[in-house]
Amino acid sequence: PFPPDNPKRMLSLRKDAADFLKKNAGKQPFFMMVSHYAPHIPFMCTREAFERTKKRWIEAGLDTKGLDELTDDPIVNPKGEANKKITYAAMVEEMDLTLVDVLDALEQTGELQNTYIIFTSDNGGGYAENRKVDGGIRRFNGPLQEGKRSIFEGGIRVPTVISGPGIKAGSQCDVPIVQWDFLPTFHDLSGSESSLPPNVDGGSLRLVFKKGNKGKVKRVAPGIIHHYTCHYHPPISSIIIGDYKLMRQLNSGEFLLFNLKTDYREEKNLAASMPEKVKEMDEICRSYIKKVKGGTAEQVRQAHHKLMDHFGQQSIDGYRKKLADLK
């Protein structure tokens, strides 16, 4: 359970991050990763953050239906749409304050200009069907298709903000990257003389940091490839090369081809009009998946089920131990 004065452990994570930097920054090269439990269900925030966000909500003239008096402190899984949205917004704000603490700590140690900072997310927003909001239809993860667990852009396109030495302030870069690029990037930036394993999927982003859109990423994989990432979603493989993204439904064999530069919403399927592009990208994707023994749809599904069974058994064993300890 989360401490009542520290919902989602946001406050202690902020403090621990700042304390680590004050203790270590400037003495030797360091790496720190802060992974919050927020934003994620259950929605939680402090009473102070809720009231602050509620005030802005009302001042903005937003829907106050269901804005009932709350007794929880902190606010936990509130009822009513307005309360849920306010709690979620307050939770995100409390999480984002980690950046303030991190930047302040780096500034105090004199290492702010000598440190790479990466702000990103592990997946896209939660998938939600179209809903009627304020008299209109809104897709809550729009304008992107689908969301978390999906290989459509709504599931894999995430915010990524990077600052550090050699990166031009206020610049925007459209070179596609993927999070498994970070390991070879950190290895490259650290100046390590040891080598990475030969078949690491990602590539260093050093040239992208320095040259922006003119930078290139050299990877072992011939593009950015995803292969059946979620066992309870339709089995799909995808590959992104340049502006184009090809998706193949592993059961039906259906192809979807999108030009992400002109159609990031993935609304216009170009597969029928560009058969040669489909063939070229599909052969590259299949060849790589075969090379790394990615498996068939059924093999991947069974591997996921086996893993879930393992997690389930761990939970059962844990509860049994707790019961035995209580007795």
Language model features by range: what are they?
Residues 1-180, 189-200, 248-251, 261-266, ...:
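Active-site-proximal cap/lid insertion segments
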Residues 20-22, 235-248, 256:
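Short, surface-exposed beta-strand/loop micro-motifs that present aromatic residues
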Residues 148-153, 226-230, 236-237:
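Short Gly/Pro-enriched turn/cap motifs at secondary-structure boundaries
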Residues 207-217:
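Acidic, glycine-rich loop-and-strand cores that form catalytic or ligand-binding grooves
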Residues 218-221, 282-301:
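Bilobed periplasmic-binding protein-like "clamshell/Venus-flytrap" ligand-binding domains
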